[in-house]
Amino acid sequence: MHWKNIMPLVNPLPKNTNSEITELAKFFNETLGFCPNSVLTMMHRPKIAKAFINLNMAVMENQGRVTSSLKRLVAYVSSNVTGCRYCQAHTIRAAERFSTEQEKLDHIWNYQTHPSFSEAERVA
């Protein structure tokens, strides 16, 4: 069977199914420019969707010493290490949207030696 013929076991819900989760999903609309199908699928279980969204909001919050850009770069590298193409696509998109310098995106795999990365970024 070709991968294109595989259907999901659970279909994503329409974006406006649950007003509370739809409100929380605005985080992804701001971060990625869209709400991922994984979140729309989680909406079948609103408590799970809410917990997932709140976790993402807490981790990626724009406060503290770690910049939003660096958080997204770390997420991208982590996604690559685990082999999750779905997460790779979302984290690199978020890094772009959070104004990560193109030089860093182009040289992410040389972060330990490339001059565009600071010592703090190398440690992260």
Which sequence ranges carry the predicted segments?
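Iron-sulfur (Fe-S) cluster-binding segments and ferredoxin-like electron-carrier domains
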Residues: 49, 88-107
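Short linear capping/connector segments at secondary-structure termini
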Residues: 72, 107-112
